[in-house]
Amino acid sequence: MSSGCRSVGGSTWGHWRGDGGDLRQRRVLSPVCSAPAAGSWIGSQLGNVGNLLATPHPLGKPASSRVGTIVLACLLLFGSCVVRAVPTTPSPPTSTPTSMSTHSHGTVDPTLLPTETPDPLRLAVRESGILAEDGDFYTCPPPTGSTVVRIEPPRTCPKFDLGRNFTEGIAVIFKENIAPYKFRANVYYKDIVVTRVWKGYSHTSLSDRYNDRVPVSVEEIFGLIDSKGKCSSKAEYLRDNIMHHAYHDDEDEVELDLVPSKFATPGARAWQTTNDTTSYVGWMPWRHYTSTSVNCIVEEVEARSVYPYDSFALSTGDIVYASPFYGLRAAARIEHNSYAQERFRQVEGYRPRDLDSKLQAEEPVTKNFITTPHVTVSWNWTEKKVEACTLTKWKEVDELVRDEFRGSYRFTIRSISSTFISNTTQFKLESAPLTECVSKEAKEAIDSIYKKQYESTHVFSGDVEYYLARGGFLIAFRPMLSNELARLYLNELVRSNRTYDLKNLLNPNANNNNNTTRRRRSLLSVPEPQPTQDGVHREQILHRLHKRAVEATAGTDSSNVTAKQLELIKTTSSIEFAMLQFAYDHIQSHVNEMLSRIATAWCTLQNKERTLWNEMVKINPSAIVSATLDERVAARVLGDVIAITHCAKIEGNVYLQNSMRSMDSNTCYSRPPVTFTITKNANNRGSIEGQLGEENEIFTERKLIEPCALNQKRYFKFGKEYVYYENYTFVRKVPPTEIEVISTYVELNLTLLEDREFLPLEVYTRAELEDTGLLDYSEIQRRNQLHALRFYDIDSVVNVDNTAVIMQGIASFFKGLGKVGEAVGTLVLGAAGAVVSTVSGIASFLNNPFGGLAIGLLVIAGLVAAFFAYRYVMQIRSNPMKALYPITTKALKNKAKTSYGQNEEDDGSDFDEAKLEEAREMIKYMSMVSALEKQEKKAIKKNSGVGLIASNVSKLALRRRGPKYTRLQQNDTMEDEKMV
């Protein structure tokens, strides 16, 4: 660039070219040679240089750069000037796009200068600027009208409406009845026990046992059990096509009383003729003995039957393969029965007997009897439709809301947090089997709830309606209306002078649910024509068509009857789906209502704000349109439309100048001047001077000016931060955190969903599930154990009394001898009984504690006696004569002689030799007897026949041997002599 001066003869047009080519037509100020006038551009630049010297550079540049800046300014002021003539005709400008032109009408701005290379002062000014470190900057060309927009007119806002028809009422919910039909039944049978016992020499064992149950005949039930409270001891039963007979205790048939059983379960009663069974054992060993026990048993038990009621089970474990509703009446004959007709019997007007009180029933009943191969069962017959029902009441709902939505009914029950869905058509109770109880129970429950809660506030608006909900729940619903609403309906009728049915008016859905369809016309409705002479052909055709229609209808009806089957309603075991449906409907209703209201409010707010936008666009169209389009645009109002152009993002650097003062000392920029480059890595020749706009928008012109004011303070957004100017001079950067924020947003306050707890509900309780089967196995087990304890205790069965058997045998023996033998037998048995009683008394005494002490004393006494006996035996062995005949001793003889007056010296001459010989013979005989007894004992121990024979022979020899001694005299000679 030359250092000469160019005279300012006027303003010229041109383009300033940088390295990037043609950029934009803009104004360039030329330097002047003379001293700057007031407000001239050079004066402005000098003022900027002074401010630059007075204010420390924010980037911390060294002092050498400041000195260079001063030198450069002096050269500009005092350098030589070269004056050139400036052509009066401006040079033609470089062509630019129409949309980028400054003025759309094509006029030239006289303040713009031709393109030239920047002088050092301009470079210094740019270098002293503040670089934007972050943030996005945009440059917006002025709109020319090639693109125009308009504001949308107001919209029609939607109105909140659920679109449902709500009806309140009372309901009763029914479920499938899985519980069996229960009734009382009597079981009659005779328990036969045949025992076979082996009798050995010293033991008895049970070798076989036969047990069987045989039914009691119906005649015996009539004649003995229910008439006298007794039962026969005889049993007749058929086994293997052979009629067998059994008698209790193998005796003749007798009538035994039925006594209550001591063992009975809470749900059953029993009576029997005996509590024990005995076994007969004869007196002869090495034989088998057979005995029979017959026990007549009557049990009152619980019977159960489940759908389709073709059999029932007893708590004894027996199953009867016949329906409990089978009978001889017309309606009962179609029920199931697997037994022959002769095994079944039905008695009208029967009065059973209570075996405890021995009283007959006052009211007669219809009694059924079935004889099976093992038992006879009786029960009171009842009608099936009266007692059996396939549905049972589950819940009584005192507050239910029904709404119609998308062709279905939704029954909402807040008390159990459940929603049931059904069709809009009513359910016919006739299509399900055994549902006669539903209508009765539903009516009673609904009437009871109405009288307690709603009689004074509501009125019924229809009859009871039945709907089959999903999951197998039958809902009996009766709609209601409040008294106020019903009064409004009545007033409407009076006002309009109408005579409609009040029920149809209060419940408009009733007509839709009656399932009434228009009857289709057919040939059946046309009477059969009678032939006439005028229209014979036509009447013949009608006759044939009528006949075909009758045949087709008959065939269709018969097929429908055979194909029509009643379907049993199956109910799910859980209502979790209904609870989830209730939760979903509750959330859906709340959310939909909330969103609908938000949409309505939003639309209303937008319509109101549209008026504000329409007025604000006249003040600042660029800001309004940019906020509306959510995009940076430049806008200008063209009448009733708005012209817009899109802004381009600046990719290069943006420098902010320190001073906002212009060349005129009285005029300043209202927004900071900047220098920027369009592209990255552009040199100084590609820089453009502009002005900082709002929200980081860069103007390519510096038109925003104002009169300079004192104490001026401004904050401008530059990038992501703010810059602070005071007296039109840059002071510092201000972070956004130091500036307090004022929010212009309106908070949206929404109501949250209310909390709702799900209650655990059981459709079937545990007791109901346990009670669903035919057999109660716990009851069966208890009954079988108690039955075994009652009748089959092995301790009472094998209880053989040998004494009683012997006594019975002796009595039978004497009884066979006639009356004399029977009398003798009575005497003998009485004595034997006394002996047995004595022995039993002794045995009981020994079992007593005092008896043990007595036994101890007896043992001690026996030991003492044994000691004295042992001493006596030893004395006999040592001196048998002295021990056996102590009178033969010498002392006794001397004493006798002394008493008769004799001397001791005469002993030898006067001793009686005959008596001595007799004594010797007696001792010898006693020795032989002792030896004979020993021999006999040895023979008995050895059980040898030879020894026994020898012993008997010895006894005979001793008996036949004559005595060796003479009879003693009655009077002693010595006594006679003494007396003389």
Curated annotation (Swiss-Prot):
- Residues listed as glycosylation sites in the UniProt record: N165, N275, N380, N423, N497, N514, N515, N560, N727, N749
The listed locations are: Virion membrane; Host cell membrane; Host endosome membrane; Host Golgi apparatus membrane
Residue ranges, annotated region (Hydrophobic membrane proximal region): 794-847, 823-843
Q: Which organism is it from?
A: Equine herpesvirus 1 (strain V592)
Note the superkingdom of the native organism: Viruses
Q: Where is this region: Disordered?
A: 88-118, 505-535
Q: Tell me how this protein sits in the membrane.
A: Single-pass type I membrane protein
Cleavage, annotated site positions: R521, S522
Please report, in chain numbering, the residue ranges of the motif Golgi targeting: 925-928
Q: What residue intervals traverse the membrane? A: 850-870
Question: Can you summarize the PTM annotation of this record?
Answer: A proteolytic cleavage by host furin generates two subunits that remain linked by disulfide bonds.
Q: Which residues lie on this side of the membrane: Intravirion?
A: 871-980
Swiss-Prot/TrEMBL keywords? Disulfide bond, Glycoprotein, Host cell membrane, Host endosome, Host Golgi apparatus, Host membrane, Host-virus interaction, Membrane, Signal, Transmembrane, Transmembrane helix, Viral attachment to host cell, Viral envelope protein, Virion, Virus entry into host cell
The main location class comes to virion
Disulfide-linked positions: C140-C647, C157-C603, C231-C296, C389-C437, C668-C708
| Gene3D superfamilies attached to this UniProt entry | 1.20.5.1890, 2.30.29.100, 2.30.30.1230, 6.10.250.3280
What job does this protein perform? Envelope glycoprotein that forms spikes at the surface of virion envelope. Essential for the initial attachment to heparan sulfate moieties of the host cell surface proteoglycans. Involved in fusion of viral and cellular membranes leading to virus entry into the host cell. Following initial binding to its host receptors, membrane fusion is mediated by the fusion machinery composed at least of gB and the heterodimer gH/gL. May be involved in the fusion between the virion envelope and the outer nuclear membrane during virion egress.
The UniProt entry annotates the motif Internalization motif at 965-968
Q: Which residues form the signal peptide?
A: 1-86
Q: How does it assemble?
A: Homotrimer; disulfide-linked. Binds to heparan sulfate proteoglycans. Interacts with gH/gL heterodimer.
Q: Which GO terms describe its biological process?
A: symbiont entry into host cell; virion attachment to host cell
Q: Please report which protein family the annotation says this sequence is part of.
A: Belongs to the herpesviridae glycoprotein B family.
What ranges are annotated Virion surface (topological domains)? Answer: 87-849
Q: What is this protein called?
A: Envelope glycoprotein B
Q: Where is this region: Involved in fusion and/or binding to host membrane?
A: 197-203, 282-290
Q: What cellular component terms from Gene Ontology apply here?
A: host cell endosome membrane; host cell Golgi membrane; host cell plasma membrane; membrane; viral envelope; virion membrane
Instruction: List compositional bias (Low complexity) regions by residue number.
Output: 96-118, 505-516
